[in-house]
């Protein structure tokens, strides 16, 4: 089990509440900062997720930790019957709703404030479930994964997009330098929440990846 990393170490709130508070605070400039910090690569990764999901021709899609809705907007091109974006941060969802309205996709995409560990859906509801850069923010990873399995249809597809730590030189050293030093500096300069991007860096570095994460999924 990975170490529990929280945004605000001096707060008495649980991780779930802290994560919601943090993303509410940074929601308005999250998209712009995300493009800068990821060097735009996050867009390419999301396109790959859409490609994988599209092969299943899903009718019901759920995007967990949907944030400002980048992925649900892209998945609208798959023409499913229904797309639901779920997130614990109302602030992020408000930004996403404005983007969806601008794209005239409000009749296709539904945005819901909700907890990934206690989702308001029946068993076996979705043909496809996606989580992009969100599982490391789960307060209880095992519980969140079990809840995903509950609402996913038996023949459905789950696609999780997450950062991981490179293991080979020089990528390992370059990644650590960027995430430990450059990313927090960018966050402190441009973000309203000075600790948010330090948390995002720390949580990414401590989260299980590769075989370790696959073992969690297979439990």
Q: Where would I find each of the regions flagged by the language model?
A:
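N-terminal auxiliary segments of SAM/dcSAM-dependent transferases
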Residues: 1-20
């Amino acid at each position: 089990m990975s170490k529990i990393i929280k945004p605000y170490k001096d707060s008495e709130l649980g991780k779930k509440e802290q994560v919601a508070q943090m993303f509410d605070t940074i929601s308005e400039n999250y998209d712009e900062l995300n493009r800068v910090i990821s060097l735009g690569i996050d867009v390419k990764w999301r396109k790959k997720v859409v490609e994988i999901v599209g092969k299943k021709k899903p009718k019901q899609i759920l995007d967990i930790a949907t944030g400002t809705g980048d992925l649900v907007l892209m998945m609208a091109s798959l023409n499913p019957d229904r797309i639901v974006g779920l997130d614990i941060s109302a602030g992020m969802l408000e930004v996403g709703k404005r983007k969806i309205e601008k794209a005239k996709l409000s009749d296709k995409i539904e945005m819901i404030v909700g907890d990934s560990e206690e989702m308001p859906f029946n068993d076996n509801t979705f043909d496809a479930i996606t989580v992009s850069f969100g599982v490391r923010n789960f307060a209880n990873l095992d519980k969140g994964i079990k809840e995903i399995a509950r609402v996913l249809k038996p023949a459905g597809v789950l696609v999780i997009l997450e950062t991981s730590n490179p293991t080979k030189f020089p990528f390992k050293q370059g990644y650590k330098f960027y995430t430990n030093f450059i990313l927090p500096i960018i966050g402190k300069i441009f973000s309203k929440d000075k600790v948010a991007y330090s948390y995002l860096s720390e949580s990414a570095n401590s989260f299980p990846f590769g075989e370790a994460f696959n073992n969690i999924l297979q439990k």
